[in-house]
């Protein structure tokens, strides 16, 4: 394992075809220490460990590691700015000079340490004292075997590493505010802290966070949001179900009350129907015959009224008995009848006809009183009488006498007497 690690380091430090040239800027080691350039392929391998002679091992280790540069001071480090050995270029003023090779002591057992790298002072501040030193401890059995480590590299004690004292830093309130603004504090809830502790993640108190920490924090917060949304949905569902249950209870109670009212109304309706049927039976038993007789009587009276009413008129005036018995002659004999020839003619032929018919009726029925028809136009008598007076006839006197006799026989009322008297006076 030791040879493998050493050969790997040689492959990294040296080019496969040798060094680029004898330029000291490219390879600062002196030619006195390296008399000739040797390739890795030309190295002789003898024995089981690869090298049998002590001188060859010294040359090999001197080619790999320069002990003078390991513990060199400032000028030695400044001469090799482009060194490929991997050592730090920073000066180390506190490093003690290189210790010479010490022979191995029989007691105590010597410890061989190979110093591979020493970090810079900045790395030493942040890390422990021994973190930048890699040592290989060899047991005492290696004394008998040929060693690859030169005696110049064997030291009994590790070189002391200086510790830098921290400088006091004074911050003003403005600087503190600026720092707080630049790196705000990370506020976490109790639920987030609990979930982070379950995840086994410890987040810093200040921002910013790394991508992995931000991813974990987002995951935790998403879990919390999902949990809260699930709780809200369950709460709303429970409230909705409680509201439905309350409504169902109210509707069921109202339904029971309405059912009771319906039953009561049905009972009342049945009682009313029974009462109505009883009343109908009573009316049929008592009023069937009476209703039939009354309707018949009403129909009979109405028919009689229709028959009697047209012939009976109480508002029509009846002629009086005096008007029925009175008789007014249509013609009057003038006093001038005898003055002209002794002949008289009837003034009106219609009047003579009526008188003749009246006489015939009296002869046929002496007990009946004949009423002469009334003259519809009484004004016609007046010019006839005037004509009779102007043209008297000799026969008027002869006709007037039997007419007066006829009227006297009938027993006319006193008005008729006056008329006859006036007629006689006119004749005189």
From Swiss-Prot:
Provide Cytoplasmic-side residue ranges: 1-294
> Where does the record place it?
Endoplasmic reticulum membrane
Entry's SUPFAM superfamilies? Leucine zipper domain
Name the major location. endoplasmic reticulum
| Lumenal-facing ranges | 316-428
Processing after translation: Controlled by regulated intramembrane proteolysis (RIP). A fragment containing the cytoplasmic transcription factor domain is released by proteolysis. The cleavage seems to be performed sequentially by site-1 and site-2 proteases (PS1 and PS2).
User: Which residues does this entry assign to the site Cleavage?
Assistant: 338-339
Q: Which residues are glycosylated?
A: 418
Q: What's in the GO CC field?
A: endoplasmic reticulum membrane; nucleus
- Give a single Pfam family match: bZIP_1
Composition skew (Basic and acidic residues), residue ranges: 354-368
How is this protein positioned relative to the membrane?
Single-pass type II membrane protein
Functional summary from the UniProt entry: Transcriptional activator.
Record protein name field: Cyclic AMP-responsive element-binding protein 3-like protein 4
User: What gene is it encoded by?
Assistant: creb3l4
């Amino acid at each position: 394992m030791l040879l493998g690690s050493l050969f790997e380091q040689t492959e990294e430090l040296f080019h496969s075809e040798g060094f680029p040239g004898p330029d000291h800027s490219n390879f600062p080691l002196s030619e006195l220490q390296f008399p000739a350039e040797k390739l890795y392929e030309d190295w002789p391998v003898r024995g089981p460990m690869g090298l049998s002679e002590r001188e060859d091992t010294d040359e090999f280790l001197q080619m790999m590691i320069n002990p003078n540069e390991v513990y060199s001071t400032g000028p030695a480090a400044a001469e090799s700015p482009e060194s490929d050995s991997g050592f730090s270029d920073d000066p180390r003023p506190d490093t003690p000079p290189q210790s010479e090779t010490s022979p191995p002591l029989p007691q105590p057992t010597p410890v061989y340490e190979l110093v591979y790298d020493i970090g810079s002072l900045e790395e030493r501040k942040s890390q422990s004292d021994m973190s930048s030193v890699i040592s290989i401890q060899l047991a005492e059995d290696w004394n008998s075997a040929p060693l690859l480590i030169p005696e110049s590299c064997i030291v009994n004690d590790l070189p002391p590493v200086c510790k830098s004292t921290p400088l006091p830093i004074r911050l003003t309130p403005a600087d503190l505010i600026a720092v707080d603004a630049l790196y705000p504090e990370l506020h976490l809830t109790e639920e987030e802290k609990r979930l982070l502790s379950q995840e086994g993640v410890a987040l810093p108190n200040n921002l910013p966070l790394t991508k992995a920490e931000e991813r974990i924090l987002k995951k935790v917060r998403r879990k919390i949001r999902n949990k809260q949304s699930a709780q809200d949905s369950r709460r709303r569902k429970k409230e909705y179900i409680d509201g439905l249950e309350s409504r169902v209870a109210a509707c069921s109670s109202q339904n029971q009350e309405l059912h009771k009212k319906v039953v009561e109304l049905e009972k009342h309706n049945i009682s009313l129907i029974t009462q109505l049927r009883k009343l109908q039976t009573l009316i049929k038993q008592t009023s069937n015959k009476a209703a039939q007789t009354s309707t018949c009587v009403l129909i009979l009276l109405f028919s009689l009224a229709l028959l009697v009413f047209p012939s009976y008129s109480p508002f029509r005036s009846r002629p009086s008995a005096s008007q029925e018995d009175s008789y007014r002659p249509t013609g009057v004999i003038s006093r001038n009848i005898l003055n002209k020839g002794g002949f008289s003619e009837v003034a009106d032929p219609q009047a003579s006809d009526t008188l003749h018919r009246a006489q015939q009726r009296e002869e046929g029925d002496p007990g009946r009183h004949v009423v002469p028809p009334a003259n519809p136009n009484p004004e016609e008598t007046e010019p006839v009488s005037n004509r009779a007076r102007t043209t008297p006839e000799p026969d008027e006197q002869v006709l007037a006498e039997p007419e007066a006799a006829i009227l006297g026989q009938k027993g006319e009322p006193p008005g008729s007497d006056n008329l006859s008297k006036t007629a006689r006076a006119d004749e005189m």
